[in-house]
């Protein structure tokens, strides 16, 4: 309920906020498509083609820029971009994560430099965290703050050394329903 009210603060009632949230989830998961299975197959094929193209390019780094963001992430040699699909033990294709809109890879954990500001809230362990700003140097978080939930965010990041480095980076097209 708290998340529904956060996403739809102008809903007339708690029930309407929850209904609106479910409606968005169903749209994002392509449930309303005439043939949802076909829609997901086509979408997965597009994501796979993007991952294949990125794998051929083998960029050395990604540079993210936006208001409040200027972050360069180094990519390891021979990195692999993945997309939506996976193969189970029986050799059958499936989508383990829905909705999925991104292609993703693992960055070089030693090569993250700059800062990023979150444009969306984060829900962690029952806490809503907003206005997150993270600064990286040589792959490690050196500063982090949040307008709301600052201490929760700091505790999350500084509870172990591994939490201070990035383990994944993703590319999501701007018109995506989750961007």
Language-model region placement:
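Dual-mode signal for accessory low-complexity, basic/Gly-rich regions
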Residues: 113, 143-179
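Active-site bordering "gate/hinge" segments
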Residues: 1-113
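Short, solvent-exposed amphipathic alpha-helical segments in soluble enzyme
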Residues: 78-80, 88-90, 132-135, 158-161
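Generic serine detector
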Residues: 13, 49, 60, 83, ...
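Weak global preference for isoleucine
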Residues: 25, 46, 71, 87, ...
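Long, well-ordered mid-to-C-terminal structural blocks that present hydrophobic/aromatic surfaces
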Residues: 103-155
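Short, glycine-/Ser/Thr-/acidic-enriched flexible segments
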Residues: 2, 69, 78-80, 121-123, ...
């Amino acid at each position: 309920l708290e998340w529904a009210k956060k996403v739809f603060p102008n809903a007339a009632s708690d029930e309407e906020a929850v209904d609106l949230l479910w409606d968005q989830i169903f749209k994002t998961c392509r449930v309303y498509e005439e043939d949802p299975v076909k829609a997901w197959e086509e979408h997965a094929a597009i994501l796979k083609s993007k991952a294949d193209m990125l794998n051929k390019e083998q960029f050395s780094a990604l540079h993210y820029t936006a208001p409040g963001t200027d972050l360069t992430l180094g990519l390891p040699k021979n990195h692999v971009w993945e997309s939506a699909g996976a193969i189970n033990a029986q050799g059958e294709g499936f989508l383990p994560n829905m909705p999925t809109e991104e292609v993703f890879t693992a960055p070089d954990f030693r090569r993250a430099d700059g800062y990023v500001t979150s444009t969306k809230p984060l829900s962690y362990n029952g806490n809503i965290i907003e206005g997150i700003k993270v600064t990286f140097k040589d792959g490690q978080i050196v500063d982090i703050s949040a307008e709301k939930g600052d201490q929760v965010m700091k505790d999350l990041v500084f509870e172990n050394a591994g939490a201070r480095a990035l383990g994944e980076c993703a590319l999501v097209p701007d018109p995506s329903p989750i961007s």
